[in-house]
């Protein structure tokens, strides 16, 4: 398989990296991350005008990319810049609506690409422990529509989204893949309560309570009780995005550390000349390349289906979780005490790498999932 980027992708990467380097400095990013909104609407609009959100979707959805490698190119650059704007949720929600949305819902994808709408993925629940099928929020029929009740946790930009993609159970038990439905819910709908709070790595998330939220019948995304497959497909693209973002962040942490080792002196020489530190940096470099390979493999597999797709995605998420923690720890230790300070950008990259591990399943979850998928493959079960 040829993993070389096309000219169009290289141009996209160059444009985005240049834009972030010139317009998204660490100082401006830090100010934005600590703002009441946790992101910049103006910067979000500028990213959209540059076509970055459009690169996440295919032409049928109003974009011009949508391949796993298009997504990886974008998110690797976003990881290098520690971008806090809501790209991940735009990707996941947009994928779900493009796949299963009705004619009234698909225009939301176009609005996100244009920058006129912000969407949030409201799926995780307290106690779900990363299990995608663990949904306790309930949707019951009422008249010609639906009524939703439940609680969603750690919803990215949940305070400021225009629309929430909410998973709710319409039948079956709490852990069943069958019986899960998806709904497009206006954030300002009656019965929706949002409690926002700040993340340790910058930006904001929210806990969203749904109490007797009445929805029209056309709020249902796809078919009743058949939302899990749409959910799994969309989250798969999110895993590719997180893997690529982590690689971008790791690259910058490595660059900061190498620069410090070249300039920090002890006993009259740069500490980078000490053999023990050289060996540690060599291990970091090898680890990052392993993470990059796993991310590339996930980007290549995400457009497929079945167990092999899911194994590649879980392998990538496990790898970037384990390696991201190692890169963060080694980079801080090689910097000494200064590596922990707020003023040094490195500490923010370290926090982001730790948080990436906990999004859409941590390394322990995905290692266990990878093993279970392998067992299923050996038993001849071809479904994920």
Segments from the language model and where they lie:
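Short beta-strand-to-turn element immediately C-terminal to the catalytic PLP-Schiff-base lysine
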Residues: 98-101, 140, 166-169, 184-186, ...
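Flexible, small-/acidic-enriched active-site or ligand-binding loops
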Residues: 130, 134-137, 185-216, 223
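A generic, well-ordered mixed alpha/beta core segment in the N-terminal half of proteins
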Residues: 99-118
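Alpha-helical interface subdomain recognition
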Residues: 1-85, 100, 115-116, 141-146, ...
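Cytochrome P450 C-terminal beta-domain/meander region
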Residues: 131-149
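A short core secondary-structure module
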Residues: 149-193
């Amino acid at each position: 398989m040829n993993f070389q980027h096309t000219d169009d992708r290289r141009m996209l990467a160059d444009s985005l990296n240049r834009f972030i380097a010139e317009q998204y400095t660490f100082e401006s990013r830090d100010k934005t991350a600590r703002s009441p909104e946790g992101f910049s609407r103006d910067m979000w609009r500028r990213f959209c005008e540059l076509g970055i959100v459009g690169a996440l979707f295919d032409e049928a959805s109003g974009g011009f990319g949508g391949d796993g490698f298009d997504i990886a190119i974008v998110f690797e650059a976003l990881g290098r810049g520690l971008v806090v704007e809501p790209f991940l949720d735009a990707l996941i929600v947009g994928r779900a609506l493009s796949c299963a949305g009705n004619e009234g819902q698909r225009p939301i994808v176009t609005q996100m690409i244009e920058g006129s709408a912000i969407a949030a993925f409201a799926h995780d629940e307290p106690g779900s422990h990363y299990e995608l099928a663990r949904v306790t929020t309930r949707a019951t029929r009422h008249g010609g529509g639906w009524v939703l009740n439940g609680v969603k946790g750690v919803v990215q930009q949940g305070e400021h989204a225009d629309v929430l993609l909410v998973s709710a159970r319409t039948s079956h038990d709490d852990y069943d893949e069958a019986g899960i439905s998806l709904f497009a819910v206006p954030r300002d709908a009656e019965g929706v309560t949002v409690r926002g709070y700040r993340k340790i790595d910058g930006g904001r998330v929210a806990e969203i309570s749904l109490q007797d939220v009445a929805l029209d019948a056309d709020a249902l995304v796809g078919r009743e009780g058949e939302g899990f497959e749409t959910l799994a497909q969309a989250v798969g693209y999110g895993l590719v995005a997180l893997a690529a973002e982590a690689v971008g962040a790791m690259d910058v942490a490595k660059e900061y550390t190498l620069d410090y080792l070249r300039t920090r002196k002890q006993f009259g020489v740069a500490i980078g000349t000490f053999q023990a530190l050289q060996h540690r940096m060599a291990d970091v470099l090898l680890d990052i390349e392993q993470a990059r390979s796993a991310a590339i493999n996930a980007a290549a597999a995400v457009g497929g289906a079945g167990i092999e797709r899911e194994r590649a995605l879980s392998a990538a998420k496990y790898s970037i979780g384990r390696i991201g923690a190692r890169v963060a720890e080694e980079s801080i230790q090689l910097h000494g005490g200064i590596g922990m300070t707020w003023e040094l950008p490195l500490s923010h990259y370290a926090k982001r790498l730790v948080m990436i591990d906990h999004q859409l399943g941590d390394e322990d979850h995905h290692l266990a999932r990878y093993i279970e998928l392998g067992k299923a493959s050996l038993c001849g079960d071809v479904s994920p």
